[in-house]
């Protein structure tokens, strides 16, 4: 089972915030910054970004078993105890959508600011992201990761990340699956 450590941080609530996740087994650390947000949104964004990242990696997505380790009781209790999802619905919908691809997720709460080295590192990255206004930082550049992907893996990655693309790249509203995305990409070249 792949372990993923996630954390979010916010200066003020609301205020500038950062998120981070670490996948030690794959040597992946990713962080991001949002100008005006809440701590719960940042905690949840870290999880959504982590699942988006691994969904695009074919070798991982075949196993479909992950453990999300977070110091957010908000996330763990919502996912394991049926707490009501009445705020941050856009992120909860995205999380549900990502999980619907067959991920088997174990949700584990870890004590924050304790002796867990990966949780401490996630906190450091998340705080650093909002203090330094780091939009997105990866251990491998996007281009390095894209060059390693097959066309099919790239289509899956792109399809998973369509919601992030700037609309100036053209309309992709008719794209509903990876094969249609390949056709759309070919029509643009």
Tell where the protein language model's regions lie, with residue ranges.
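RNase H-like nuclease fold core
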Residues: 1-41, 45, 52-59
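RNase H catalytic domain
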Residues: 4-13, 48-138
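Signature tryptophan residues that serve as conserved aromatic anchors
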Residues: 19, 107-109, 143, 184
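Short interaction-hotspot residues at assembly and binding interfaces
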Residues: 153-189
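Pocket-edge positions in alpha/beta enzyme catalytic cores
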Residues: 34, 38-39, 83-84, 114, ...
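Short acidic, low-complexity intrinsically disordered linear motifs used
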Residues: 139-153
């Amino acid at each position: 089972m792949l372990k993923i450590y996630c954390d979010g941080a916010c200066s003020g609530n609301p205020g500038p915030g950062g998120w981070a996740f670490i996948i030690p087994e794959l040597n992946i650390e990713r962080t991001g910054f949002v100008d005006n947000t809440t701590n719960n949104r940042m905690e949840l964004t870290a999880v959504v970004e982590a699942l988006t990242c691994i969904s695009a990696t074919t070798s991982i997505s075949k196993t479909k078993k992950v453990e999300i380790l977070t110091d957010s009781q908000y996330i763990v209790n919502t996912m394991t105890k049926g707490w009501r999802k009445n705020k941050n619905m856009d992120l909860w919908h995205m999380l549900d959508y990502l999980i619907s691809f067959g991920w088997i997720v174990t949700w584990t709460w870890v004590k924050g600011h304790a002796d867990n080295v990966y949780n401490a590192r996630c906190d450091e990255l998340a705080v650093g992201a909002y203090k330094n206004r780091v939009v997105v930082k990866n251990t491998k550049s996007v281009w390095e990761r894209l060059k390693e992907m097959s066309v099919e893996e790239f289509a899956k990655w792109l399809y998973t990340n369509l919601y992030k693309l700037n609309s100036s790249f053209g309309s992709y509203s008719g794209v509903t699956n990876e094969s249609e995305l390949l056709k759309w990409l070919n029509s643009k070249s």
